[in-house]
């Protein structure tokens, strides 16, 4: 079965569970399968939630909540960091979009 069909089947199953009022725990298996499908295609998805943030990070684009400080942490992730494995190297294909706040 093609990757696209597998993804669409998982999305459809998630939609059915949400429409039936199922809780988030019942959807966890579908999310694991979706991530696994993309990992099998060479993508690495990283959630930087609660990591330390500094302006020198090249894998995140941040919006600051409150006033900037010397020590900041990631408090919300709108988009994850995504890498793709290509011929024994990792290539950043998407920077995370995050919200940061003073520690």
Task: Show which residues each predicted segment covers.
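Extended, amphipathic alpha-helical stalk segments that mediate dimerization
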Residues: 1-21, 29, 36-103
């Amino acid at each position: 079965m093609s990757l696209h069909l597998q993804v669409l089947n998982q999305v459809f199953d998630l939609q059915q569970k949400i429409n039936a009022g199922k809780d988030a725990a019942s959807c966890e298996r579908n999310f694991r399968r979706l991530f696994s499908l993309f990992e099998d295609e060479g993508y690495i998805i990283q959630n930087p939630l609660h990591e330390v943030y500094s302006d020198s990070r090249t894998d995140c684009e941040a919006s600051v909540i409150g006033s900037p400080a010397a020590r900041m942490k990631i408090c919300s992730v709108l988009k994850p960091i995504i890498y793709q494995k290509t011929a024994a190297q990792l290539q950043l294909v998407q920077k995370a979009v995050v919200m940061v706040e003073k520690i």
